[in-house]
């Protein structure tokens, strides 16, 4: 069953499958399955199947965009200015981030829910709608795509050794307007 439609049915199917057909390892390939595998890692591993994903407490710190930006700020890692209008109020948030900026759901993938806003009217038109569909969201400094956009993937063993890696240039910036609603 599709995970997006019924997490419980997906979990039941996966655990039954692993019980009937033992597997050495599960490697989630998409955001929804990565989130699922991290949340239910201990249950899956009870069947002797290693789950190649961090435990939930570690995973969510990097998966939640607001949390990740807070960690970057704390560590002094360059990152787009990010603020939560629900926590600090619109005026303080926009004074920190500035226009144009993006509304970004904390938990989403594939640019879903991301919308570029250029003024207060845009904010008023989109912020509540996006948070009602996608949950907690932030506003983030818009950084125009002026050069190459590279994607780097690194797979490491538990001891930190790089097992595999890849780097490629994205052919286009998607979506052009900063995001999709669905």
What residue ranges belong to the model's regions?
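Glycine-rich phosphate-binding loop signature in dinucleotide/nucleotide-binding domains
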Residues: 17-23, 96-97, 132-133
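Mobile, glycine- and charge-enriched loop segments
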Residues: 1-4, 84-85, 126
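Short beta-strand-to-turn element immediately C-terminal to the catalytic PLP-Schiff-base lysine
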Residues: 85, 114-119, 154-157
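ATP-dependent carboxylate/phosphate-activation module, predominantly the ATP-grasp catalytic core
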Residues: 121, 141-182
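ATP-grasp fold ATP-binding core
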Residues: 72, 94-116, 135-146, 165
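Short, well-ordered alpha-helical microsegments
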Residues: 34-38, 90, 123, 148-149
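Conserved N-proximal alpha/beta basic substrate-recognition cap immediately N-terminal to
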Residues: 2-81
């Amino acid at each position: 069953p599709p995970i997006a439609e019924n997490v419980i049915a997906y979990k039941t199917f996966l655990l039954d499958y692993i019980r009937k057909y033992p597997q050495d390892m599960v490697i989630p390939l998409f955001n929804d399955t990565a989130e699922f595998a991290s949340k239910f890692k201990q249950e899956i591993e009870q069947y002797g199947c290693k789950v190649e994903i961090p435990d939930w407490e570690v995973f969510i710190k990097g998966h939640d965009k607001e949390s990740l930006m807070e960690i970057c700020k704390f560590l002094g890692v360059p990152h787009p200015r990010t603020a939560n209008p629900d926590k600090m109020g619109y005026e303080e948030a926009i004074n920190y981030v500035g226009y144009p900026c993006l509304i970004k759901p904390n938990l989403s993938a594939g640019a879903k829910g991301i919308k570029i806003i250029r003024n207060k009217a845009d904010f008023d038109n989109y912020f509540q709608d996006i948070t009602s569909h996608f949950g907690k969201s932030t506003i983030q400094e818009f950084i125009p795509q002026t050069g190459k956009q590279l994607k780097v993937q690194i797979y490491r063993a538990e001891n930190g050794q790089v097992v595999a890696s890849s780097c490629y240039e994205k052919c286009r910036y998607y979506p052009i307007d900063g995001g999709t609603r669905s």
